[in-house]
């Protein structure tokens, strides 16, 4: 047999490799990945790398502008607030209650919503109809308004705000998973799997979940963005984290009256919140596009 007639078989790249190639070549997605990794590191080590304590006050250095300003000091890179506290230290320490708290809330809402949504999507009849009406009722209430109502009864505290945001995100997550599972169950490949003898659990695990991953990632990133904004909004309204907590929303609300005197005390926490939400959305969109490319 001649050797030149033997060819090596080329294996097509797998789903994960295709998805990673798509994700790696997407510049906004990589920006979101590195940015979210930086936020995660700040949530863990932000309090340790802060140059000063969150409540450490410096007499005679109140309302000091950032270091690049004419009257700024290098020792206080982002300036100080009205009590002489270092703004950079408070921003670094405030990543944990704002972004870290939002991540915990989103993770809990995702796990509970995934279980309830899959169970609701796989059932039919009266139970599905009752759950559908309950979810529609809860979804008619804005998430921030629902969180404010819960905090009004429980009292202002960061843990109460996190519970309120979780309670506001849960119906949206359940509804999204329910709709995706219900739509997938009506497709032909699920009917073919049932005729082939597959159980409901196998269909949900091996057929439904891989096909709703892209939509689920979109909902998770949307929920994380909403959680960051809602926790910051409750802190801004003095219903969440209480002063002297360095939570970004509480910092923003405390410095609001200084917007004309010391605008950096308002702009920097607001910029941190905006940048966090932007990075989360960039990462989520990149993951969704990569998953769709890998599945296709």
Curated annotation (Swiss-Prot):
Mutant lacking the gene: phenotype: Loss of resistance to protamine.
All residue ranges annotated as the ABC transmembrane type-1 domain in the record: 99-284
InterPro entries: BP-dependent_transpt_permease (IPR050366), MetI-like (IPR000515), MetI-like_sf (IPR035906), OppC_N (IPR025966)
Induction data: Part of the sapA-sapB-sapC-sapD-sapF operon, RNA detected in mid-log phase cells.
Localization: Cell inner membrane
Membrane-side (Cytoplasmic) residue stretches: 1-28, 120-133, 218-222, 279-296
GO molecular function ontology, one term from the record: putrescine transmembrane transporter activity
A Pfam family annotated for this UniProt entry: OppC_N
A Gene Ontology cellular-component term: plasma membrane
Cell inner membrane recorded as keyword: yes
UniProt keyword Cell membrane, yes or no: yes
Transmembrane segments: 29-49, 99-119, 134-154, 197-217, 223-243, 258-278
Segments in the Periplasmic topological domain: 50-98, 155-196, 244-257
Membrane topology, from the record: Multi-pass membrane protein
UniProt KW keywords: Cell inner membrane, Cell membrane, Membrane, Peptide transport, Protein transport, Transmembrane, Transmembrane helix, Transport
GO biological process terms on file: peptide transport; protein transport
Recorded family membership: Belongs to the binding-protein-dependent transport system permease family. OppBC subfamily.
Function: Involved in a peptide intake transport system that plays a role in the resistance to antimicrobial peptides.
NCBIfam families membership: PRK15111.1 (NF011691)
Protein name, per record: Peptide transport system permease protein SapC
Organism of this sequence: Salmonella typhimurium (strain LT2 / SGSC1412 / ATCC 700720)
């Amino acid at each position: 047999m001649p050797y030149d007639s033997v060819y090596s078989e080329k294996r097509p790249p797998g789903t994960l490799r295709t998805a990673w190639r798509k994700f790696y070549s997407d510049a906004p997605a990589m920006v979101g990945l590195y940015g979210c990794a930086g936020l995660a590191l700040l949530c863990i080590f932000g309090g340790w790398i802060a140059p000063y304590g969150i409540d450490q006050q410096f007499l005679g250095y109140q309302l000091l502008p950032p270091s690049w300003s004419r009257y700024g000091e290098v020792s206080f890179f982002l300036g100080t607030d009205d009590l002489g506290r270092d703004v950079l230290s408070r921003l670094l320490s405030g990543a944990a209650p704002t972004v870290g708290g939002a991540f915990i809330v989103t993770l809990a809402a995702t796990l509970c919503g995934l279980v309830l949504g899959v169970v609701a999507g796989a059932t039919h009849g009266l139970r599905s109809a009752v759950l559908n009406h309950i979810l529609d009722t809860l979804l008619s209430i804005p998430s921030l308004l629902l969180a404010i109502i819960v905090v009004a009864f429980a009292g202002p505290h960061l843990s109460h705000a996190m519970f309120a945001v979780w309670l506001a995100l849960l119906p949206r997550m359940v509804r999204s998973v329910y709709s995706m599972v219900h739509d997938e169950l009506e497709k032909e490949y699920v009917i073919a799997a049932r005729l082939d003898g597959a159980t409901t659990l196998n269909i949900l695990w091996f057929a439904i979940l891989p096909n709703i991953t892209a939509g689920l990632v979109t909902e998770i990133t949307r929920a994380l963005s909403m959680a960051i904004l809602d926790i910051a909004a409750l802190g801004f309204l003095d219903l969440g984290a209480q002063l002297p907590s360095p939570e970004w929303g509480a910092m923003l609300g405390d410095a609001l009256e200084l917007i004309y005197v010391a605008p950096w005390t308002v702009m920097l926490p607001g910029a941190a919140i905006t940048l966090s939400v932007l990075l989360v959305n960039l990462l989520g969109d990149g993951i969704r596009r990569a998953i769709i490319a890998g599945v296709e």
